[in-house]
Amino acid sequence: MKTLWMVLCALARLWPGALAGCAEAGRCCPGRDPACFARGWRLDRVYGTCFCDQACRLTGDCCFDYDRACPARPCFVGEWSPWSGCAGQCQPTTRVRRRSVRQEPLNGGAPCPPLEERAGCLEYSSSQSQDCGHSFVPAFITSSVFNKKRIIQAVSPQWSTHTKDAGYCMEFKTESLTPHCALVNSPLTRWMQYLREGYTVCVDCQPPAMNSVSLRCSGDGLDSDGNQTLRWQAIGNPRCQGTWKKVRRVEQCSCPDVHRFIFI
């Protein structure tokens, strides 16, 4: 078969236009396009009508020079934009970041990755710079990683210098949770998969989630006797929620990182 192919190629040199293909026709088309064809040798070594569209790989009727004339080019995207502010004030909502396409995929190249990401957030200052957002029940929690990105004075200017380091940790024993916590798989919500029934978790109460007057976090359960069932909800996935009971208050959280969260 290889010898026959070499003979055909040699004969083609004596037959003008026999090796016409995508390059000579100047064609490279997306998807399936019956009008995107040329006359020449196909990759399956049949001479006749051959195609220069993206679907020819599946149908096996590409022109012999398709790979060279129409190389696959993957999608290229730019860098992520900075995170936006919260979409609303004084209530659980979302923030967003986006990136743009620098080059669309061509000729079956790798598709574009997600161009938008959302994450939960809660602002504690209204448009009139009034302290707010502390009256929510149940307790709203998120990953402790988010705590590193909170800027105290920008969110709540009422905090004085000597109270910036105020805070405490609440330990809870998880009683129940919805199955939706284990179904999320984005980088920003993966922490929810570590919530488990019967586990003890730690939740930090830090500014700005801490009320600047009461020095408490909403939903901290500090006043419960330990037998009261309290409710919590994960920021970023409202269907991830459940119940827990207070274990104790401590000054510093000592749980493993995957079982350490913050009030928000």
From Swiss-Prot:
It holds the Pfam family SBSPON_C. It comes from Mus musculus (Mouse). It is found in: Secreted, Extracellular space, Extracellular matrix. Disulfide bonds join 28-36, 28-52, 36-70, 50-52, 50-63, 56-62, 63-70. Keywords: Disulfide bond, Extracellular matrix, Glycoprotein, Secreted, Signal. Residues 1-20 form the signal peptide. Belongs to the thrombospondin family. One of its GO terms (cellular component) is extracellular region. Glycans are attached at residue 227. The keyword Signal applies. The gene is Sbspon. This is Somatomedin-B and thrombospondin type-1 domain-containing protein. It comes from the Eukaryota. Residues 74-125 form the TSP type-1 domain. Residues 24-75 form the SMB domain.
